[in-house]
Amino acid sequence: MTTASFESYGELDGLGRCTTAFANIGKDLMPAEKRGSIGEVKPTGWQTAKYDNVDGKYLYNRCHLIGYQLTGENANAKNLITGTRYLNVDGMLPFENMVADYIKETGNHVLYRVTPVFSGDNLVASGVHMEAESVEDNGDGILFNVYCFNAQPGIAIDYATGDSHQDDSIVADASKSTTAADANVQTYILNTNTKKFHKESCNSAK
């Protein structure tokens, strides 16, 4: 592993789908300004669908493989997939926040890779595979290897096209997903009030 920062985004495949985003994230890659517009990017399977039972109404987000807070990528089509609100906020964001907090607190680097998983020729990913390891301390601070489902409670999704409809029988099964708290429980504890991860020795974790 190296302590030199870098970022790399795989070429889109023959169907225009994202492949893999890979980076060694340090403070120097993290953005100093607010995120710009990404609305011009239409990832594969993109649909504008609104439901009253979805937080924020919109089913789909333009979901960064590597979050903006980590590498400052805006409208990079190689880094944006069609992801549900649930994937973006409840699935990926806690892990992204964990990494961002660690880098800001330590100044260390985190080797980070996110790969969308598509079934066959589907245009919408079934989920994303997230991997991370802190470099300078050989994974003592950050170490996870998780899969986050691209699903939405109460909504049925046709992953081949991105079409969707309301189906209240669909419930997210947390037992099938690895949570951020589970991924590094020996090093970080989730403060349920602030939604932030803290080291076990930190007063904020108690």
Report each predicted region and the residues it spans:
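Domain-level detector of nuclease and nuclease-like folds
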Residues: T2-K176
